[in-house]
Amino acid sequence: MNKLLFLIIAIVALGWSAPVSAVERDLIRVAISRAADSVNLQGDGMLALRETGMAVVLPPAATVSVGHGQIMLDGTGYRRLRITAAGPIKVNTKSYRGVLELSASNGVLLVINELPLEDYLVGVINSEISSTWPMESVKAQAVIARTYAVAKRIERHGSPYHLEATVMDQVYSGSDLEDSRAARGVHETAGQVLTYHGKPIQAFYHATCGGKTEDSSHVWGAALPYLKGVDCQYCALGNSNTWEQALSLSRLETALKVAGLTDIRLGPRNSRGRLKTVLLSTSHGTVTMPATKFRMAVGSTVIKSTNFTVRVDDGSAYFSGSGYGHGVGLCQWGAKQRALDGFSYSEILSYYYPGTELRILAPDAGF
């Protein structure tokens, strides 16, 4: 038993201090919590490794909190801990494979899940779509999630983590949503990424476009040739293709940080049919706001896209729109319908990301 414990500690210690290698390039670091004062951990055989290489054997349940600029465990302060276990570790209500790294950042806990990229992807599938969808659409999701993660790993090299586990990057719910179809979609596309001129692309995607995907230049200002808008008649069958929302002007005043809001008018639309600007009529004059900023300020789950109309009546604004998300790149519901129509995942990807090429991640690729 002591020899086994020593072996486990040695393996974990290597994970802390080993130089960058092909194996490490297969790992992804995901921030699963960035604002908590404490987290509850549960797992069998949990070990906490200090930066010195010394290990602390943890009970099956433990609480880690922040205090005096350190992370606190059983009354002792640490700068950073790496925690491993015999199986997944539950963090509050969700379980995670791999290693957890905990540190204090700006008075709160930063919890990072470090695990093999392919394991991470299995946890992404059912967080972003449903593995019950046609397998070719599941495979397409696996490839773009892998590509997105690899591109972020390059972009954020040297940062504490590569990705957030939220819509700020792509949603990742740990191991709880894993299933055999999600694993199959990842396994049958193992290592495949979308590239442009030999480099992984910025593989943006969204729920449903409302009939036309958007140019990246209209959203972020960067015109990428593989993120040009395309027509997408398939997403008309999507779950959130059209939407309506009624909001009081007082609520909008708070969200938009304006006073005396009396009317909302629409500015010009771009070539893809989405609004460029929104005009806010207030008691102090007219405020012109970029439509994307307006959407994010009110809430991206409330105003689901920048393709909408609005009327103001009796102190409320009534919105009607189509699409859900920024509209750039792959339309998830459109991809589902294309798969139902017999398109392969590679055909789906080449349609939404024109000019790209599928390539296999290689140990000497540098990414």
Residue ranges, per PLM feature:
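Conserved, single-site charged/polar hotspot
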Residues: 1-367
